[in-house]
């Protein structure tokens, strides 16, 4: 029992000394970040250079639009005339304009689909009044094919 207790005491003191050495090399700075000092001379940290005034602050890459992309920018309502479009535009602006045009085209396609459905219903009702149903058309076609087969059999 005594040796176990002594072993625990030695291990505890060893742990405390290691802990003390580790925490003495770490100190809190004003920004409350842990900073390790290892006893060597350290260079003072340099502040990052301020960005140039000539570059964009968001660092957005710019793109020179083609004629087709200029038309898309006009169709989307972003610009009124082609003269108003700047020489370079951001990719985000182009994507937003393309998405608007896609939505407008999909609305047109939906309207054309609905108009086509209504037109087919009207044409179907007109054909039903003239008794041009699919059943009657199929029966006429089969009768005509039978007659042609009978005529062919007689000639042979």
Curated annotation (Swiss-Prot):
Cellular compartments annotated: Mitochondrion membrane
Q: Which terms does the UniProt entry file under GO BP?
A: cellular response to hypoxia; neuron apoptotic process; positive regulation of apoptotic process; positive regulation of release of cytochrome c from mitochondria
Disordered: annotated span:
37-57
Return the annotated region ranges for Required for proapoptotic activity: 78-104
How is this protein positioned relative to the membrane?
Answer: Single-pass membrane protein
Q: Which GO terms describe its cellular component?
A: mitochondrial membrane; mitochondrion
- Pfam families, sorted: DUF1075 (PF06388)
Question: Superkingdom of the source?
Answer: Eukaryota
Q: Which UniProt keywords apply?
A: Apoptosis, Membrane, Mitochondrion, Transmembrane, Transmembrane helix
Where this protein primarily resides, as one coarse class?
mitochondrion
Q: Which family does it belong to?
A: Belongs to the UPF0389 family.
Subunit composition and interactions: Interacts with HSP90AB1; HSP90AB1 is essential for FAM162A mitochondrial localization and pro-apoptotic activity. Interacts with VDAC2; the interaction is probably involved in inducing mitochondrial permeability transition.
In UniProt terms, what function does this protein have? Proposed to be involved in regulation of apoptosis; the exact mechanism may differ between cell types/tissues. May be involved in hypoxia-induced cell death of transformed cells implicating cytochrome C release and caspase activation (such as CASP9) and inducing mitochondrial permeability transition. May be involved in hypoxia-induced cell death of neuronal cells probably by promoting release of AIFM1 from mitochondria to cytoplasm and its translocation to the nucleus; however, the involvement of caspases has been reported conflictingly.
Q: State the protein's name.
A: Protein FAM162A
Please give the organism. Answer: Bos taurus (Bovine)
